[in-house]
Structures are given as structure tokens and as C-alpha cells.
Design a protein with these regions (language model features):
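C-terminal motif of bacterial Sec signal peptides marking the signal peptidase cleavage site
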Residues: 16-19
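N-terminal onset of structured domains
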Residues: 27, 31-38, 48-60
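A short, amphipathic beta-strand motif
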Residues: 41-45
Length: 183
């Protein structure tokens, strides 16, 4: 009986070690953090000249967002901007390995990007969100003093400067006979 227990423990330990060790190192997402994060994206979906109902798009499960860096579906909700319902999600922050950082007299600065894929009515829209980072000198010693914020996005090789107001970053997905455009 004792030999069976010992054998079982050895097999269990070997199985655990085999599961934990992998020839391929798993990629871990380590987002760039700051005390102030501006990564909310508002989305309006338009078919021709008519805005589609955000509530209906979510209810019918025909709108979703996937964060490429985090490898997760991102929560989407309905928000209101200037009296109009829009879809809203928080884009992935850039992974630390995707950040280019440098020091200045005013503190640390940086740029980076994170990719997301929006699926709307079966169409897949790949977007690259560009961020700017800034931190005051010795910001790590303060409760605050650093910001990472969305600046622009790229779609099909073109840079798009979205509508920005009240700290909001709004894009429009417009359905055309060829698919979607991003404005």
C-alpha cells in the first residue's frame, strides 16, 4: 500500500512538472501602466446614412471586440455621448515590450501601440491603437504624475485622427458595399 502511495505521488509530481514546463515559453501580457489611463474608445456604427442601435448590436451579438495583446474579449457597453447612444470599450494598453521610452528634462516620455479586432455583423476590422506616455520626474514616488493616452489609430495602413472631446476617443464604422470604413 505504501509503495502504491509513493508511486502515485511520484507520477503526480511528474505530471505537474510536465504541465508546468513547456518548450515554448508562454507570452505574458504586461500592459504599460500609468496613474491616468485614457483608453476608452467610443464607436458609432452607420449603415449608409443611418446609425445602427448599439443596444440592438449587443443584444443580437453582432458586435464584439478582441484585444490582441491581452488575448481576451473586451467588455463592450452602451454609453451616451452628447445625447447619442454609442458603443464603448477600453482598448488594450500596449505591452511593455511594445513601448519606446526615453528620458527628457521634463520626465519620461514614450510611444507604443496595441492591436484590437472589432467584429461587426460578421466583418472583422483590425485596428492598431497608438498611445503616448508621459511621466513627471520621479513619478514612481508619487501617487500620480504619469499618463498613457490614446492618440491615433491605424486601419489598413492609414492613420486616422479620431474625434476627441471630453477625454473621449470616438470612431465611426461606416458600412459600405465593400465592407466597413473607419473614420
Amino acid at each position: 500500500m505504501r509503495q502504491i502511495k509513493s508511486g502515485f505521488i511520484i507520477v503526480a509530481l511528474l505530471a505537474l512538472l510536465a504541465a508546468c514546463s513547456n518548450d515554448e515559453e508562454k507570452r505574458r501580457y504586461l500592459p504599460m501602466l500609468a496613474s491616468n489611463i485614457e483608453n476608452e474608445v467610443l464607436v458609432e456604427v452607420i449603415n449608409g446614412t443611418r446609425a445602427l442601435s448599439p443596444t440592438t448590436l449587443l443584444r443580437d451579438s453582432v458586435f464584439s471586440v478582441f484585444g490582441i495583446e491581452s488575448e481576451k474579449s473586451l467588455p463592450v457597453k452602451v454609453s451616451v455621448l452628447e445625447g447619442k447612444e454609442v458603443l464603448s470599450f477600453r482598448a488594450d494598453l500596449p505591452d511593455r515590450t511594445l513601448m519606446d521610452l526615453w528620458d527628457t528634462d521634463e520626465g519620461r516620455r514614450g510611444e507604443g501601440y496595441a492591436d484590437s479586432e472589432i467584429t461587426v455583423q460578421g466583418a472583422h476590422i483590425h485596428l492598431r491603437f497608438y498611445y503616448a506616455f508621459s511621466a513627471l520626474p520621479r513619478a514612481e514616488l508619487m501617487r500620480g504624475g504619469s499618463t498613457i493616452a490614446l492618440q491615433t489609430l491605424e486601419y489598413q495602413g492609414q492613420t486616422i485622427n479620431p474625434y476627441k472631446r471630453y477625454g473621449c476617443f470616438k470612431i465611426v464604422l461606416r458600412r459600405t458595399p465593400q465592407g466597413f470604413t473607419v473614420e
